[in-house]
Amino acid sequence: MKKLTKKQNLFKTFLNHTKKYDIDEGITLLKKMATSKFIESLDVAINLGINPKNTNQNIRNTTILPHGIGRLIKVAVFTQGENEKIAKKFGAEFVGLHNLIETVKTKTILFDVAIATPDVMPYVSQLGPILGPRGLMPNPKLGTITEKLEYAIKNAKSGQIHYKNDKNGIIHISIGKINFENTKIKENLNALISSLKQSKPSQSKGTYIKQVVISTTMSSGIKIDLNTLNNAS
């Protein structure tokens, strides 16, 4: 029989995989199991009552987490002229058009969010095969194709996240770091769930928030009792 690693033994000691934990208990358990030398991200997987094969039920949206995700968000802005000065003024790390496009073509991507003004989208559209699979392609529905650069950059840097369901109808997203206070983790999670409920497709019937599982970068998942979340029912 293969010997369990120290980390696996730790999970086995603390975790009952069949149990649904109170949110506070679940967060506390994750903190006990987070023994890595780096500060692990705190991730959530939310199983939704949607049919992902039906395009009308697929979900893609943004929301702002009240406490951010615990790291500096680097923003790229594709634009030209006076808008370049505006983007730099409000803190975008990478600003420009043709030079920035050529950099991305080399697959050197050092930013977390890409924003573009509408006038340059005919140029930026060629980056779809590179930025699209990474979830970085500017999109008007996500507020990342806009003339309002100040607003878009501030949102990106203040904890705005972009989420969409996978082919199984599950949302996977980071909502912070394991060293966040429990209250801040819960408030971030509740903000996400509130946004998801507002995005519920009219065609979705029955239970919408079916399951919530929290984990860290290196841990097993912990199922959460939905009754202990403020707005998941």
Swiss-Prot record:
Record's keyword terms, sorted: Repressor, Ribonucleoprotein, Ribosomal protein, RNA-binding, rRNA-binding, Translation regulation, tRNA-binding
GO cellular component: cytosolic large ribosomal subunit
GO biological process, one term: regulation of translation
SUPFAM superfamilies the record matches: Ribosomal protein L1
InterPro entries per the UniProt record, alphabetical: Ribosom_uL1_bac-type, Ribosomal_uL1, Ribosomal_uL1-like, Ribosomal_uL1/biogenesis, Ribosomal_uL1_3-a/b-sand, Ribosomal_uL1_CS
One GO MF term: rRNA binding
CDD domains according to UniProt: Ribosomal_L1
Cited Pfam families: Ribosomal_L1
Matching NCBIfam families: rplA_bact (TIGR01169)
Family assignment from sequence similarity: Belongs to the universal ribosomal protein uL1 family.
Record's function text: Binds directly to 23S rRNA. The L1 stalk is quite mobile in the ribosome, and is involved in E site tRNA release.
UniProt-listed PANTHER family: 54S RIBOSOMAL PROTEIN L1, MITOCHONDRIAL (PTHR36427), LARGE RIBOSOMAL SUBUNIT PROTEIN UL1M (PTHR36427:SF3)
Record text on subunit structure and interactions: Part of the 50S ribosomal subunit.
Protein name: Large ribosomal subunit protein uL1
Gene that this polypeptide is encoded by: rplA
